[in-house]
């Protein structure tokens, strides 16, 4: 038996560390009375939605203005005194105390990066205090579903210095019998793709998320991915499909979308996406239209919502208010879940719950500025989300999440269920 006093928060410390892009980020450690502790590091995005929670940066010359000493100080000087003495088991109370202390709508007082670091570290400390893995602590005995990975193997847009407008072209190995086999399938296609790009004289340098960043058009990227799937010995659309992150807010201005040398209004943009769905085995499209183009999104949902998964990232920013607006207007059918968009674990879980109750899927996601923290791997299993998006098959901050999912699958043994094997995850009309 555990002593409840052992699970009381005793000390909280924080430090400035680096993310995968060499930018500062916040790490927090929560230590409990009984000696257990938890550590977490927050990620950071490149293409950020205008409605995301506020990430506090120092400004000035240090680290080119990207330092996070203010956020670190807020943890140690303001958050720690407010939380010490609370039970780490009451995650909702811990997060509520920080939100009350912050007092703003977008966490701009303390910084979402300060609040989230403590929120995630607290959950891990509580799990460690109970002797439970994080996925089991958060998800209970039903946390046995391993997610279908959406593997970003070709990077463009804000994630790479190339000519590709769309931000991510992903492999979706939904036809695998297990997560381990899905990872193998994706990895084999990744290496096959590298050989194809090299043979065509294209760059095999990788972008922020570990995918290749060749100079291609959007159609060419789809064509070479299908070729790589086939050459690796798999059937496009049956075993491995494609997913896109258009990140269209990045090339939207004055009511028009400018990409691949053309300029399109919302209806024309929807038409362009329809053509791609007809041409390729695409099962999921993220941010197909800009974050505040609600009318365009409604049209996209009417035209493609019954055929493919339409994921709102910048549209919803893991925010229940914006998600409810989408639900009420039948806009999109899926939400991308990024813990640092909303800034606390409790609010993240609330967004996933609202999505599930409303018939929307959830895709647990990393950010382009990642770290070795593997919380989102456990979160994907804990919430039975059935999908995870955590980059390519290179760069250790991406692979860390895949390796954690392998460990979880092994630990679950015969209880483990791969979402793709039971018809969950994106399947589209492939």
From Swiss-Prot:
Where do the annotations place Mg(2+) binding?
245, 286, 313
Q: What coarse category fits the chief subcellular location reported for this protein?
A: cytoplasm
Q: Which GO terms describe its biological process?
A: glycolytic process
InterPro entries reported in the protein's UniProt record: Enolase, Enolase-like_C_sf, Enolase-like_N, Enolase_C, Enolase_CS, Enolase_N
Q: Top enzyme class of this protein? A: lyase
Tell me the protein family, please. Answer: Belongs to the enolase family.
What's this protein's function? Answer: Catalyzes the reversible conversion of 2-phosphoglycerate (2-PG) into phosphoenolpyruvate (PEP). It is essential for the degradation of carbohydrates via glycolysis.
* Name of the featured protein: Enolase
Q: Which organism is it from?
A: Synechococcus sp. (strain WH7803)
Q: Which gene encodes it?
A: eno
